[in-house]
């Protein structure tokens, strides 16, 4: 069972992400990774086969100052345990990084569609199609691109999207795979389960199926799958 963590706020993101992944180790996994925005406003991905502590050792030496990021522990479903198959995955333009829990049942069909449209896919996973589908649908409006991507997918998903085109935001979506959002005065948090973020907040909202959320350090805005705004009390 995979684990997801995300954070955007006033603190350095990497320690929050690593602590969250360590708190989700009980779910079982074979690889771990994270993505943050570096000072050049491009996506920095660090991932590898093995334990979260291995990932922690790699990122410590980089001293990444980013205050926004997404992270993941993977339990192999499509594709063997490997660095290449570990999350996050990124599209061919390096503009959209994604972590994903769940199983995309029609990924082979969607993979063929992307290849026919000139995309190159490097992993054996079903997840890698997601950032490339967002790229395929993107025309300047990421929410529209995410909407069209979600409507392409058959199966289950909990998704986080990070992009330098929207450097203060994380985009998330959920269907048949758990995702919880935590809010606080020093930022907002995302996780697949409460233990990953309970150290930082006790204000939680469990997303419902077919919801999309746009999260920055001060706010969370919800939409249905057709991008109609949802008011959450």
What are these regions (language model features)?
Residues 1-233:
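Conserved short alpha-helical segments that host acidic/polar catalytic motifs at enzyme active sites
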């Amino acid at each position: 069972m995979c684990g997801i963590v995300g954070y955007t706020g006033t603190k350095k993101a990497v320690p929050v992400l690593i602590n969250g992944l360590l708190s989700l180790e009980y779910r079982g996994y074979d690889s771990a990774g994270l993505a943050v925005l570096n000072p050049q406003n491009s996506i920095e991905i660090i991932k590898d086969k093995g334990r979260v502590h291995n990932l922690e050792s790699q990122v410590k030496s980089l001293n990444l100052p980013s205050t926004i990021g997404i992270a993941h522990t993977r339990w192999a479903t499509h594709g063997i345990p490997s660095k290449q198959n570990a999350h996050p995955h990124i599209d061919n333009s390096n503009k959209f990084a994604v972590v994903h829990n769940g199983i995309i049942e029609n990924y082979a069909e969607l993979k063929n569609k992307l290849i026919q449209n000139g995309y190159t896919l490097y992993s054996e996973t079903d997840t890698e199609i997601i950032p490339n589908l967002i790229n395929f649908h993107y025309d300047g409006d990421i929410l529209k691109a995410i909407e069209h991507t979600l409507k392409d997918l058959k199966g289950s998903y909990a998704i986080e999207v990070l992009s330098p085109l929207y450097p203060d935001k994380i985009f998330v979506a959920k269907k048949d795979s758990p995702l919880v959002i935590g809010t606080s005065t020093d930022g907002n948090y995302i996780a697949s389960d409460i233990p990953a973020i309970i150290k930082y907040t006790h204000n939680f909202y469990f997303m419902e199926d077919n919801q999309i959320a746009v999260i920055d350090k001060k706010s969370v805005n919800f939409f249905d799958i057709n991008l109609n705004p949802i008011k959450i009390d």
